[in-house]
């Protein structure tokens, strides 16, 4: 079978879980994806052969990650309604994955990516000058906005994230790596 020759005819529950996780979090290590969602090696290979997934290496380590291709992101958006996260870097995204795995299904289903948050503030508040957080979710009726802070963030960038959360009316949480 050549890449892109056919599409998935039927999504299984494990496929949906894996594709949503990849769409929401960016880069995921293969073993983590398999352990968390139960997706099989064969199914991962099928998704790679269909050009929905590809393996990438972290430039700073020998770690290998899976991520959605453009075709995969389009498929996840069209079929599952997930606005896919624009990945930064595997190490950054691995912190998002770690957070995601400790959430309830309801919290995961309330997940909004940075792309969605940017569109919301643009549409609802008419602002395009605020930098949204990496993601948000609802827990106990409260909207939590989470930002993964790396060593190259300036104080100004962090303030922009806080300003965004204040404009949206939620709770700000940051994770420093």
PLM regions: where:
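Conserved catalytic cores of phosphodiester-cleaving nucleases, focusing on short active-site segments
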Residues: 99, 103, 119-154
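Nuclease-adjacent, charged terminal/linker segments that flank catalytic cores
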Residues: 1-83
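A structural signal for well-ordered alpha-helical scaffolds and beta->alpha junctions
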Residues: 40, 92-97, 129, 158
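Catalytic cores of nucleic-acid endonucleases
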Residues: 143, 148-177
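Hydrophobic, Leu/Ile/Phe/Ala-enriched alpha-helical segments that form helix-helix packing faces
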Residues: 47-48, 99-107, 162-166
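Acidic-basic catalytic patches of nuclease active cores, encompassing PD-(D/E)XK
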Residues: 80-122
């Amino acid at each position: 079978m050549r890449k892109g020759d056919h599409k998935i005819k039927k999504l299984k529950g494990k496929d949906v879980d894996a594709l949503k996780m990849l769409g929401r979090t960016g880069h995921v290590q293969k073993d983590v994806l398999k352990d968390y969602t139960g997706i099989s090696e064969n199914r991962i290979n099928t998704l790679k052969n269909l050009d929905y997934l590809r393996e990438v290496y972290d430039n700073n380590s020998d770690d290998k990650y899976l991520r959605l291709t453009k075709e995969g992101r389009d498929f996840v958006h069209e079929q599952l309604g997930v606005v896919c996260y624009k990945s930064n870097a595997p190490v950054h995204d691995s912190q998002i994955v770690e957070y995601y795995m400790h959430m309830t299904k309801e919290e995961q289903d309330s997940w909004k990516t940075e792309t969605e948050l940017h569109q919301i503030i643009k549409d609802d508040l008419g602002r395009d000058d605020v930098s949204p957080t990496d993601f948000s979710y609802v827990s106990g009726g409260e909207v939590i906005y989470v930002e993964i802070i790396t060593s190259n963030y300036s104080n100004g960038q962090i303030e922009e994230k806080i300003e965004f959360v204040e404009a949206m009316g939620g709770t700000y949480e940051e994770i420093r790596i």
